Amino acid sequence: MASGISLESILSPQISKVTKTTDNLIITIYGYGGLGKTPVATQMEKPYYLAFGKSGLSGLNNVPFMPVMSWSEFKNLNKILCARKNYEALHQQYHTLILDEMEVLYKYCEEYVASTNNVQKIKDGNGGYGLWGDLKDEWEKEMLRLIGSGFCVVFILHAMANDDGKVMPVGDQKRMLPILLNHSEIIGYVKGNGVNPETGRSIHSSLMLAGTDEYFARTRNEYFDPYIPDFTAENL
């Protein structure tokens, strides 16, 4: 019998409760550029920002961050962040992990899998059949480790319209996105509200939390409103 499991523990289970904190919460937000995704995410509780490629922190002060330029760097960082022995020390300083430009991180993963198999591109490996299974396994292994870390994790992606005109997160629909979207309690589409004609300033974006024919969004919490009119960290 597995350690810690007994008849008594089965008959006296833990009871779930609706969470009132962001502990262990997995959030995916996506949208077109310049709508405030990164500024809002970095206002979450005790943030630690992982920058893939070009940092989105220009114009933002006092945000703890780590530039990550390869999949090997990410794997090493992820191992430290998710190690149980480091949990207490890390959580005293950080509560929210922000992963910006997830499509860039996935590109890192592609390059890593191809390189470790001595080919230029994923499609060239495995005798020309491609390394698609290896890519999916490598990506999901690290994402699952992060998802189970105990942090509030915020994934940030760009948006694109599919062939039907519906706005979706950018990324590989078969291998990259499923592990992120299937484990997210919140998938929010950041929708711009244009400019205030009187002041000439941009109006705060809205966060859409219920999907329509126009865009994809959803939450697992029936108590959430279908959208947040004023998209701020506090309102989220």
Give residue spans per PLM region:
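Charged, amphipathic alpha-helical linker segments immediately N-terminal to NTP-binding catalytic cores
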Residues: M1-G4
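Short, well-ordered beta-strand core segments
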Residues: P47-Y49, V153, I186-Y189
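Single-residue recognition of alpha-helix boundary sites
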Residues: Y48, E111-Y112, N196
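P-loop NTPase motor core
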Residues: M102-I179
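A general structural signal for short secondary-structure junctions and capping/turn motifs
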Residues: T19, P39-A41, R145-I147, L177-L181, ...
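Conserved P-loop
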Residues: E8-Y108
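Conserved GTP-binding G-domain of TRAFAC-class P-loop NTPases and closely related GTPase folds
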Residues: A161-L236
